[in-house]
């Protein structure tokens, strides 16, 4: 196996290597769940390594390479268990969009997975406009020609299952007790049901959490709840080195894994999925091709449970100071409108 570096402990094993150098050597039917965000073809270049999926010549070639990885994940996944893929629609030209999630679904079904569900993750369109300089999201376009405007892109999580029969059920015998998100659990529910030992069908705290997790749109994912990532960024990368939010990972691991399950992430990045798996009492296997990302992941995992950061949304990568693009709404007003919008969606 062409491994540049590695760190193997009792709770996790991470490899600085091309995932296709590592995955074929893992045991079939050994992974309880996989959670990851694949490279987005034609969107970013993460490194100059020819093995990097971001260095493909075309979108179609990127999907062909990705198919090999999906096939391996299918082989590794235990029967009845799941894989969760974070993705989004991709740009096609300067205005139109490509259905990347649809192609991911097709590729997984080709490998043998069954498509289970899709959850949308809400993102503030104004912040997206600032971060990406997406002119089609500018309010001034509504005034000038709304035929040129578009809807802000959501993130998605696609969930797939291998077969049906699960040899080890994922059980929450005392219901759901912790919540990953910006909403505050009503105090009355916490007081009455935190240590509830009766009929769990009547556990209203667990019901409240489940109702939010089962929602087709996750409205309160904290976009700034991340792992440290700045040290992994190299020249000209700051705008797209942004790890997957820990709230998303925590929800998926809660729903689709048991303690001590082995959780796989073939695109480790700075270690977010592996970190959360270890923090939640799971085991983790991860691969990362880029040395700077791997070093940051190694550092983050060495402090699992005590390294999370909270980044303000206007401080995320690519969110420079206000400039000529921000000709519609000043930051203070946009933040105020955002708070009002979020509070209006917190009713359950």
Residue ranges and their predicted role:
Residues 170-175, 308-318:
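Short, flexible loop/turn segments with low-complexity composition
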Residues 1-296, 334-348:
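Core catalytic lobe of class I
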Residues 16-21, 314-322:
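Conserved SAM/SAH-binding loop
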Residues 136-137, 280-281, 304-306, 312-313, ...:
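Short alpha-helix boundary/capping motifs
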């Amino acid at each position: 196996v062409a491994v540049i570096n590695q760190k193997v402990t009792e709770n996790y094993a991470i490899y600085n290597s091309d995932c296709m150098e590592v995955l074929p050597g893992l045991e079939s039917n050994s992974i309880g769940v996989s959670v990851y965000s694949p490279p987005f073809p034609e969107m970013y270049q993460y490194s100059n390594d020819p093995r990097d999926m971001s260095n493909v010549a075309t979108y179609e070639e990127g999907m062909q390479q990705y198919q090999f990885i999906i096939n391996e994940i299918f082989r590794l996944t235990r029967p009845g268990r799941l894989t969760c893929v974070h993705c989004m629609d991709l740009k096609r030209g300067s205005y139109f969009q490509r259905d990347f999630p649809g192609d991911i679904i097709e590729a997984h079904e080709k490998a043998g997975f069954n498509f289970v569900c899709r959850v949308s993750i809400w993102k503030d369109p104004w912040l997206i406009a600032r971060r990406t300089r997406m002119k089609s999201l500018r309010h001034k376009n509504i005034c000038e020609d709304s035929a040129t405007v578009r809807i802000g892109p959501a993130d998605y999580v696609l969930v797939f299952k291998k077969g049906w029969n699960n040899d080890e059920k994922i059980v929450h015998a005392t219901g759901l007790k912790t919540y990953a998100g910006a909403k505050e659990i009503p105090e009355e529910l916490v007081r009455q049901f935190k240590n509830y030992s009766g009929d769990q069908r009547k556990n209203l705290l667990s019901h409240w959490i489940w109702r939010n997790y089962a929602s087709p749109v996750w409205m309160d994912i904290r976009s700034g709840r991340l792992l440290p990532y700045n040290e992994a960024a190299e020249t000209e990368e700051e705008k797209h080195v942004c790890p997957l939010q820990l709230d998303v990972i925590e929800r998926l691991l809660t729903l689709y894994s048991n303690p001590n399950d082995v959780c796989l992430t073939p695109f480790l990045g700075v270690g977010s999925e592996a970190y959360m798996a270890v923090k939640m009492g799971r085991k983790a296997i991860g691969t990362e091709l880029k040395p700077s990302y791997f070093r940051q992941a190694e550092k983050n995992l060495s402090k699992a449970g005590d390294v999370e950061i909270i980044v303000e949304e206007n401080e995320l990568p690519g969110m420079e100071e206000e400039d000529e693009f921000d000709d519609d709404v000043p930051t203070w007003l946009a933040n105020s409108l955002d708070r009002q919008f979020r509070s209006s969606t917190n009713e359950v």
